[in-house]
Each structure stands twice: as C-alpha cells, then as structure tokens.
Amino acid sequence: MAQEVPTFKLVLVGDGGTGKTTFVKRHLTGEFEKKYIATLGVEVHPLGFHTNFGELKFDVWDTAGQEKFGGLRDGYYINGQCGIIMFDVTSRITYKNVPNWHRDLVRVCENIPIVLCGNKVDVKERKVKAKTITFHRKKNLQYYDISAKSNYNFEKPFLWLARKLVGNPQLEFVASPALAPPEVQVDADLMQKYQQEMEQATALPLPDEDDADL
C-alpha cells in the first residue's frame, strides 16, 4: 500500500490583483495537477513539498478572481486548516483590507495558522513600508515579504505553516519544488534592507491607533 501523503487545505485570500494566482502558479507540479471546482469557482492546486520527515502536500484553494465581486462564500473556507492572506506592497488599500480577510477566515476556520504575505517587493515603488505592517503582530500571524514573479521567499510561508501543522519546529524542506523560472530579479541588497527594517519595526511597540500610520 502506498503511504498516504499528509494533505492540508490551505485557503489563499486577499484583494484581487495582489498576485495570489501568480504566486500559486509558480509551483509547476501544482499548476499541472490543479483541479477546478465549478460550484465554488475555485482552482485547487496540490503543492507538494519534500521534508526531512517525508512528503506533505498543501491543497491550495485559489479564488479565481471572485473576490473582485465581494466576499467569498463560506464553502471556500470550510475545513481550511491553514491560510495565507496576501496584499500588494505597492497598494496601501490592499493592506488596509487585510483585517477584513482575516475576519472572514477566522470566522469560519477559527484558530488556524495563518501567514500574512506582502507581495511584489520586487517593485521599486514600495508603498506599504515595514513600520506600517503591524497587523500580524496584533493577531499573532507570521509575516513575510515575498515576490511571486521572482520566486523570492516562495517557500517561507509553506515551511512556517508545515512546522505549525505538523507540530515540529525542526521540520525542513529537503528538496526545492520545481518552480517556474523567475520573470523578474529582486535586488538582493534591497531585500536585505527590507529584512532589517522589518526586524527593527518588530522591536518597536505597537501603535495604539490602528490606522494612524496608513
């Protein structure tokens, strides 16, 4: 008997145009094996990762653009075991809407591990700076800068979620999944600067007023 691969439903949410579909399509096997659920208008991408404890899989639910027409149906969230909320660092409104996505996610899925991702850090005109990204600290989420088009930090959200779901901080990915070739390059020095800014911002006390710095 082939051993069943542990599989987790991952709900991917965020405003339209933040790069969710671009992000999930980077994983080539998942893109090749995706399934469309017509009743919900959802594409499910099975993203496999090889870890030091064997293989595991995330069934990533992607909205196929429905969020542009308002909220998502509960069927999208039901049985979600983990989540990624995505915003676009070049668009302040997409960050401002993060609390709405978080609220919808936890209303149905309750206490699941969630990663907040700021996408498009390859774009020079960054609008949402490290010091304004505080929502994850208030809600105990993990945060990563990512760039879907360059594959920058692609694996980070999945590794963090896998460790939480399996309950083992020693879990590592031992082989990289096949990813689509980068369409853009990130500036390594700039990424390091962003990383330092994020670390410095995390050391600061949280602002009292939620929208004071938006």
UniProtKB/Swiss-Prot annotation:
Q: Which terms are listed as keywords in the entry?
A: GTP-binding, Nucleotide-binding, Nucleus, Protein transport, Transport
Q: Which Gene3D superfamilies match?
A: P-loop containing nucleotide triphosphate hydrolases
Q: What GO terms in the biological process aspect are recorded for it? A: protein import into nucleus; ribosomal subunit export from nucleus
**Domain Small GTPase Ran-type, first and last residues per copy:** 4-168
Q: Where is this region: Switch-I?
A: 34-42
The places in or outside the cell where this protein is found are: Nucleus
**What InterPro entries has UniProt attached to this entry?**
P-loop_NTPase, Ran_GTPase, Small_GTP-bd, Small_GTPase
Q: Which SMART domains match?
A: RAB, RAN, RAS, RHO
Q: Tell me which residues bind GTP.
A: 15-22, 65, 119-122, 147-149
A Pfam family annotated for this chain is Ras
Q: Which domain of life is it from?
A: Eukaryota
Sequence segments annotated as region (Switch-II)? 65-81
GO cellular component annotations, sorted alphabetically? cytoplasm; nucleus
Listed GO MF terms: GTP binding; GTPase activity
Sorted alphabetically, which PANTHER family does this protein's record hold? GTP-BINDING NUCLEAR PROTEIN RAN, RAN GTPASE
Subunit info? Found in a nuclear export complex with RanGTP, exportin and pre-miRNA.
As for family, the record states: Belongs to the small GTPase superfamily. Ran family.
Q: What does this protein do?
A: GTP-binding protein involved in nucleocytoplasmic transport. Required for the import of protein into the nucleus and also for RNA export. Involved in chromatin condensation and control of cell cycle.
Q: What is this protein called?
A: GTP-binding nuclear protein GSP1/Ran
Q: Which organism is it from?
A: Candida albicans (strain WO-1)
